[in-house]
């Protein structure tokens, strides 16, 4: 008799995706982050669901409802901090996942890559709207500044901003709709996640060498289930360390001050995971130019398959391209640091140079380096 997991229509897909899935024998720990992102999403949906039971999306009570969750609800404090720091863990895994894709040439699978870029945008939108919900000073002013950027769109900009706000400023209508979108978007992300997996299983997995591994496959279970469980254990341990020992280390102290439209904080900045894009936005003196650069800093990932000029897929055997890749990583870390600094000398010029280098590396230097390597290898 056939095993039920192989014959039952409900379990068949799960079996083909998680148990009998053929996987390359050479994939390293850099391939763990896909499963970690799935776990992060599950943590965020579960903690978010329980937080939503106690949260009120009204400007007069939102801040108090978050305080109530932390003080009066049973284990409300751990739910709140798991959710807030879980978002940071989500983005750490996300950036490492994208970085691995860039390093090992995973973007050659165009459909999987493009769905991944859409997922990145969806997660960023969800995180931004979630940051507005506690209705602290940084929530309010962050929402005001970022939504105001849409007014840079010619002709329709001003009306578009008022339409998103639901009035003439960020107020009750804005908070209510942001809560609604923040609640529904994770489920849309879950659907996109399944589409991402669907395309991945159509093509099969890449591996560190970038060479097709059809002749050397092993079943996903037990080898990679154990490996993923170890990664998940390490991630949950790191998350709990932050939540239980220093839950506010990644937050902004200004967000413990209730939102006040009459008092602007001295330095408005988003959460740490948006700082690199925020630094690029600020480095351009023109409003529309800054907004375009902000969008392109993420959208540029769509162009990666077109910018791939190397005859090899992976960077594993390409030392010059590796130098360029790590220069890009260093540049992004510099941008993250600059995004958290005030707009004054010397941070302005450092941010501008780092922004130019970011686009220069991706659009010019990395493709040229790949062509040089092809010639050096006489390909």
Curated annotation (Swiss-Prot):
UniProt xrefs under PROSITE patterns: CYTB_CTER (PS51003), CYTB_NTER (PS51002)
Binding annotation for heme b b566: 97, 196
GO molecular function, one term: metal ion binding
Membrane topology recorded in Swiss-Prot or TrEMBL: Multi-pass membrane protein
Record-linked InterPro entries: Cyt_b/b6_C, Cyt_b/b6_C_sf, Cyt_b/b6_N, Cytb/b6-like_sf, Cytochrome_b, Cytochrome_b_C_euk/bac, Cytochrome_b_N_euk/bac, Di-haem_cyt_TM
Location in the cell: Mitochondrion inner membrane
Note on how the cofactor is bound: Binds 2 heme b groups non-covalently.
Main location: mitochondrion
Ranges annotated as spanning the membrane: 33-53, 77-98, 113-133, 178-198, 226-246, 288-308, 320-340, 347-367
Keywords: Electron transport, Heme, Iron, Membrane, Metal-binding, Mitochondrion, Mitochondrion inner membrane, Respiratory chain, Transmembrane, Transmembrane helix, Transport, Ubiquinone
Gene Ontology terms: biological process: mitochondrial electron transport, ubiquinol to cytochrome c
GO cellular component: mitochondrial inner membrane; respiratory chain complex III
Cofactor (UniProt): heme b
Oligomer and partners: The cytochrome bc1 complex contains 11 subunits: 3 respiratory subunits (MT-CYB, CYC1 and UQCRFS1), 2 core proteins (UQCRC1 and UQCRC2) and 6 low-molecular weight proteins (UQCRH/QCR6, UQCRB/QCR7, UQCRQ/QCR8, UQCR10/QCR9, UQCR11/QCR10 and a cleavage product of UQCRFS1). This cytochrome bc1 complex then forms a dimer.
Role played: Component of the ubiquinol-cytochrome c reductase complex (complex III or cytochrome b-c1 complex) that is part of the mitochondrial respiratory chain. The b-c1 complex mediates electron transfer from ubiquinol to cytochrome c. Contributes to the generation of a proton gradient across the mitochondrial membrane that is then used for ATP synthesis.
UniProt protein name: Cytochrome b
Organism: Pteropus speciosus (Philippine gray flying fox)
Organism phylogeny: Eukaryota, Metazoa, Chordata, Craniata, Vertebrata
């Amino acid at each position: 008799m056939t095993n039920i997991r192989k014959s039952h229509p409900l379990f068949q897909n799960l079996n083909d995706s998680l148990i009998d899935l053929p996987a390359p024998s050479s994939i390293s720990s850099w391939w763990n982050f896909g499963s970690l992102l799935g776990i992060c999403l599950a943590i965020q949906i579960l903690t978010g669901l329980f937080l939503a039971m106690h949260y009120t999306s009204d400007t007069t009570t939102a801040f108090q409802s978050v305080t109530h969750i932390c003080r009066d609800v049973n284990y409300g404090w751990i739910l709140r901090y798991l959710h807030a720091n879980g978002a940071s863990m989500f983005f750490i895994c996300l950036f490492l996942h994208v970085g691995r894709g860039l390093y090992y040439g995973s973007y050659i699978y165009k459909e999987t890559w493009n769905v991944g870029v859409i997922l990145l945008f969806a997660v960023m939108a969800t995180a931004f709207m979630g940051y507005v919900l506690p209705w602290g000073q940084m929530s309010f002013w962050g929402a005001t500044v970022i939504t105001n950027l849409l007014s840079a769109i010619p002709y329709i900009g001003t009306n578009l901003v008022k339409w998103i706000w639901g009035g003439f400023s960020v107020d009750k209508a804005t908070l209510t709709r942001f809560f609604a979108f923040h609640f529904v978007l994770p489920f849309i992300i879950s659907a996109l996640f399944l589409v991402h997996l669907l395309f991945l299983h159509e093509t099969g997995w890449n591996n560190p060498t970038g060479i097709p591994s059809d002749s050397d496959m092993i079943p996903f279970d037990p080898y990679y289930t154990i490996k993923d469980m170890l990664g998940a254990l390490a991630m949950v341990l790191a998350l709990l360390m932050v939540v239980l020992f220093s839950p506010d280390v990644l937050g902004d102290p200004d967000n413990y001050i209730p939102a006040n439209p009459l008092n602007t904080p001295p330095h408005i900045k988003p959460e740490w995971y948006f700082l690199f894009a925020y630094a690029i936005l600020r480095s351009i003196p023109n409003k529309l130019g800054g907004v375009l650069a902000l969008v392109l800093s993420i959208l540029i990932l769509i162009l990666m398959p077109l910018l791939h000029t190397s005859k090899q897929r992976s960077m594993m055997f390409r030392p010059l391209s590796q130098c360029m890749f790590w220069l890009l990583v260093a540049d992004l870390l510099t941008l993250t640091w600059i995004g958290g600094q005030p707009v004054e000398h010397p941070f302005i010029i450092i941010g501008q140079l780092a922004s130019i280098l970011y686009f220069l590396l991706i659009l010019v230097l990395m493709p040229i380096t790949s062509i040089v390597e092809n010639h050096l290898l006489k390909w």
